[in-house]
Amino acid sequence: MDTVSIAWAALMVIFTFSISLVVWGRNGL
């Protein structure tokens, strides 16, 4: 894998994780 692919993969993971935190926070978990 090249650097761009790794950067995109990391960005998507962080984005998905932050979205999950927002959803869980609104649900009171």
Curated annotation (Swiss-Prot):
Keywords: Chloroplast, Electron transport, Membrane, Photosynthesis, Plastid, Thylakoid, Transmembrane, Transmembrane helix, Transport
Quaternary structure, from the entry: The 4 large subunits of the cytochrome b6-f complex are cytochrome b6, subunit IV (17 kDa polypeptide, PetD), cytochrome f and the Rieske protein, while the 4 small subunits are PetG, PetL, PetM and PetN. The complex functions as a dimer.
A Gene Ontology molecular function term of the record: electron transporter, transferring electrons within cytochrome b6/f complex of photosystem II activity
Gene Ontology BP term (one): photosynthesis
Record membrane topology: Single-pass membrane protein
Any Gene Ontology CC annotation: cytochrome b6f complex
InterPro entries linked: Cytochr_b6-f_cplx_su8_sf, Cytochrome_b6-f_cplx_su8
Protein name in the entry: Cytochrome b6-f complex subunit 8
Function: Component of the cytochrome b6-f complex, which mediates electron transfer between photosystem II (PSII) and photosystem I (PSI), cyclic electron flow around PSI, and state transitions.
HAMAP family from the UniProt entry: Cytb6_f_PetN
Keyword Membrane carried by entry: yes
Compartment(s) where it occurs, according to its Swiss-Prot or TrEMBL record: Plastid, Chloroplast thylakoid membrane
Keyword Transmembrane belongs to the record: yes
SUPFAM superfamilies noted in UniProt: PetN subunit of the cytochrome b6f complex (SSF103451)
Family, as annotated: Belongs to the PetN family.
Transmembrane segments: 3-23
